[in-house]
Amino acid sequence: MAGGRHRRVVGTLHLLLLVAALPWASRGVSPSASAWPEEKNYHQPAILNSSALRQIAEGTSISEMWQNDLQPLLIERYPGSPGSYAARQHIMQRIQRLQADWVLEIDTFLSQTPYGYRSFSNIISTLNPTAKRHLVLACHYDSKYFSHWNNRVFVGATDSAVPCAMMLELARALDKKLLSLKTVSDSKPDLSLQLIFFDGEEAFLHWSPQDSLYGSRHLAAKMASTPHPPGARGTSQLHGMDLLVLLDLIGAPNPTFPNFFPNSARWFERLQAIEHELHELGLLKDHSLEGRYFQNYSYGGVIQDDHIPFLRRGVPVLHLIPSPFPEVWHTMDDNEENLDESTIDNLNKILQVFVLEYLHL
């Protein structure tokens, strides 16, 4: 997450105009598309019972995530750096070791930056790419470039090493359940899961339309021009995105997440219900309903983040970013020491339940 706070927020009027224009957005989801892209509009979750919730809570491991997924990412990893390559290899290796048969794609491209042309690489990991529809979880894996200060480097723990680790832990903890998505059956929706790790979310100098969101801008344009299913006419990979769930700035204590978009409000409400149910079952650590994460208020604007290129093309978005931002945002203190283990563990459980319910697993 990059740029000054005042540059990251679009006013309410701009947001209303943007949302109103979405159904007619160019190069994206068009009203003339065939019927299957509309299925996401009336898709319903398969609500899990208390026994299933306990099983999910027992199956996720914050200690395993911390050691195996998170700590290797707590390095300097701005685009083109040795740390960026190491982070990319780490993410790919963690996914490749799983049984669920993820299909990995690396979207590498060159883009002009304030420092000349730089190479960027998005990571796209898909279960059953032939499925027409996908629930998409996403985050960025790059860190913002800062000059070293007193031999310290910026590792972006909340921004966004923790979201990357949460997605990797979800894939590990739910591996056996996700195996069933390898094939489509008449008893299940033609629906699967996709994970996207964006490169180049951060600005190199100052946040602007040209210096930010390098990876998401490139990938959204690419997906908009790629027929889906392969060979289809009139539908693209963007039509296949049921919902883009974007994670950012997660890991600090006591976060509050507002609802940003009316067209995904019912999914935000599902997160609220899952949080409440897990709390009532005593499955959340150091958690109170007074300090719940998913709050009953809407945000009067839209924060500039990797969802924007997709939102402008009509993709429904659930933006999981706290407001206000963590106090350590864009400081050298955004590090492992200032992460809150209980919060991350609780959000892991909530997100994993959400995914299983959405996918009817």
Curated annotation (Swiss-Prot):
The keyword Disulfide bond applies. The keyword Hydrolase does not apply. It is an enzyme of class 2 (transferase). GO terms for cellular component: extracellular exosome; extracellular region; ficolin-1-rich granule lumen; specific granule lumen; tertiary granule lumen. It catalyses: N-terminal L-glutaminyl-[peptide] = N-terminal 5-oxo-L-prolyl-[peptide] + NH4(+). The active site is at E201, D248. Its EC number is 2.3.2.5. Keywords: Acyltransferase, Disulfide bond, Glycoprotein, Metal-binding, Secreted, Signal, Transferase, Zinc. GO terms for biological process: peptidyl-pyroglutamic acid biosynthetic process, using glutaminyl-peptide cyclotransferase; protein modification process. Changing D248Q: Abolishes activity. Pfam families: Peptidase_M28. Disulfide bonds join C139-C164. Glycans are attached at N49, N296. Zn(2+) binds at D159, E202, H330. One of its GO terms (molecular function) is glutaminyl-peptide cyclotransferase activity. It is found in: Secreted. Residues 1-28 form the signal peptide. Its main location: secreted. Responsible for the biosynthesis of pyroglutamyl peptides. Has a bias against acidic and tryptophan residues adjacent to the N-terminal glutaminyl residue and a lack of importance of chain length after the second residue. Also catalyzes N-terminal pyroglutamate formation. May be involved in the N-terminal pyroglutamate formation of several amyloid-related plaque-forming peptides. Belongs to the glutaminyl-peptide cyclotransferase family. This is Glutaminyl-peptide cyclotransferase. It comes from Homo sapiens. The gene is QPCT.
